[in-house]
Amino acid sequence: MSVRRGRRPARPGTRLSWLLCCSALLSPAAGYVIVSSVSWAVTNEVDEELDSASTEEAMPALLEDSGSIWQQSFPASAHKEDAHLRPRAGAARARPPPAPPGMFSYRREGGQTASAPPGPRLRAATARSLAHASVWGCLATVSTHKKIQGLPFGNCLPVSDGPFNNSTGIPFFYMTAKDPVVADLMKNPMASLMLPESEGEFCRKNIVDPEDPRCVQLTLTGQMIAVSPEEVEFAKQAMFSRHPGMRKWPRQYEWFFMKMRIEHIWLQKWYGGASSISREEYFKAVPRKA
């Protein structure tokens, strides 16, 4: 009787040990599954890499509790069998299990809320306050001079929107016909007046450069007209109360009063573009007391 040489059959104990090792290695993978396309699980190595590479200041705002997008993993048949046990629409939902460690999630764009800009009332009040506090401004006109005809021409002029206790929001001027600005206005009465906050409380205490964008700048655009005889007395009070030296200016220059019929208001009080203010909000606003 011949004995055939061959491999010895595997022992039951060895096969059982091999199965136990495989199940131990695969058991962590059955813990959680991804049910949302915006999150994923990461390993400890990737976690350390994210921590070391992430230097943006906005990163804390991107992290959120996304436990609701993670669920315990079950076979597909279990989800189908439990469909009739799920709460109906409108019923109170149970709190989802906490998210496991090592989970990273991006916040969706729809959930982000940006800080709202100042409202129209606040902008209008700031504009009226600056208009009342300003004693001078830069008036830009369309030049009629031959060398620069049709180009903008600017001139710094004393202004006033009324006496200290009576703000109108309308800038008044004390002009002479010999000023080139008046010659420009006779042909084209449209002009722009820029009022800077160079002497404001904030700029004086916090800003070195008065032209810093954080200093408020108000631009009024409209039609320059002569003050009617009925308003001359008020114009005198407005200008002479803020500029007493005007009373002694030489009379041979034939001084007269003008004002701007405002059509557009623009306010800049931070980095970036200017904000438009409606005439209704501008004249309705009450300037802050100094």
Swiss-Prot record:
Gene3D superfamilies from the UniProt entry: Electron Transport, Fmn-binding Protein, Chain A
Superkingdom of the source species: Eukaryota
This protein's UniProt keywords: Glycoprotein, Secreted, Signal
Modified how: It is not sure whether N-glycosylation is on Asn-165 and/or Asn-166.
SUPFAM superfamilies from the UniProt entry: FMN-binding split barrel
Positions of disulphide bridges: none
Region forming the signal peptide: 1-31
Keyword field contains Glycoprotein: yes
Organism: Homo sapiens (Human)
Localisation: Secreted
Subcellular location, principal: secreted
Glycosylated sites: N165, N166
GO CC, alphabetical: endoplasmic reticulum; extracellular space; Golgi apparatus
Family (UniProt): Belongs to the CREG family.
Protein name, as recorded: Protein CREG2
Tissues with expression: Brain specific mainly in the limbic system and faintly in the spinal cord but not in cerebellum.
